[in-house]
Swiss-Prot record:
Source lineage: Bacteria, Bacillati, Bacillota, Bacilli, Bacillales
A single Gene Ontology CC term: plasma membrane
Keywords: Cell membrane, Membrane, Transmembrane, Transmembrane helix
UniProt membrane topology term: Multi-pass membrane protein
Inducing stimuli: Up-regulated by mta.
Record protein name field: Uncharacterized membrane protein YdfK
Entry-linked InterPro entries: DUF554 (IPR007563)
Length: 229
């Protein structure tokens, strides 16, 4: 868990540094930083999709995942619940920034592969690299959205910790297909978040979060019953 703890600390430290900078940044500079973060999220999302979709063995799984996950998220109304919770502590656009931070920090090859490598081989390279990148990203995000970005560190710790424990318990269930499908869906969510920040269209990205749970379930069923497609 050392790598996950390091990653978490880097996000908190970066958020503190960025939050301090925010107090001295004029509105027009904050606006341009928001645009920069929006474009960065769009680019990262497109990169994840184009990099992993060609290697997918289940080319329609991401569509099914988004449809089922979106319906579940809409029924629960995660977006509304999340915004209400965040708005209790902040009247700014922190909710939008925090949701983007959670997606950027948690959905990516390094953030998923890192805990797996640490659990199975004791290799922290991915997590340490991810921690450095997330630290820099959190500085930029917090300089735009404020100290509240640090809350994403708790989500990341829970996310990576869960993957770490799952990898230890279910070593044989972890494979490249699973990571590939999760990354494709995650890339679409990051793209959606970036478009929302840019103001192109306000997508209910958080309502799509349950989509990330569908690929593990489907792939587990496929392997458990030896299904072929």
């Amino acid at each position: 868990m050392f790598g996950t703890i390091f990653n978490t600390v880097m996000i908190i430290a970066g958020s503190i540094i960025g939050g301090i900078f925010k107090k001295g940044i004029k509105d027009e500079y904050q606006d341009i930083l928001m645009q920069a973060m929006g474009f960065a999220a769009v680019a990262l999302g497109i990169n994840a999709i184009t990099q992993h979709l060609p290697d997918s063995k289940y080319p329609i799984l991401f569509i099914v995942s988004l449809a089922i996950g979106g319906l579940l998220g809409q029924i629960i109304n995660l977006e509304l619940r999340f915004n209400k919770l965040v708005n209790k502590f902040s009247k700014s656009n922190l909710a939008e920034g925090l949701s983007t931070a959670v997606l950027l920090f948690c959905i990516g090859s390094l953030s998923i592969l890192g805990p797996v490598e640490a659990a199975l081989h004791g290799d922290y390279t991915y997590l340490l690299t991810n921690g450095m990148l997330d630290g820099i990203t959190s500085i930029v995000l917090a300089s735009t959205f404020g100290f509240g970005i640090a809350a994403a560190a708790l989500v990341l710790f829970s996310w990576q910790g869960s993957i770490y424990l799952f990898a230890q318990v279910m070593e044989s269930a972890i494979n490249t297909d699973l990571i590939n499908e999760i990354t494709i869906v995650g890339g679409i969510l990051i793209l959606s978040s970036g478009l929302s920040i840019l103001g192109i269209k306000k997508f209910k990205t958080l309502n799509l979060l349950p989509s990330l749970l569908i690929p593990p379930v489907v792939i587990f069923v496929i392997h458990a019953f030896g299904l072929r497609f």
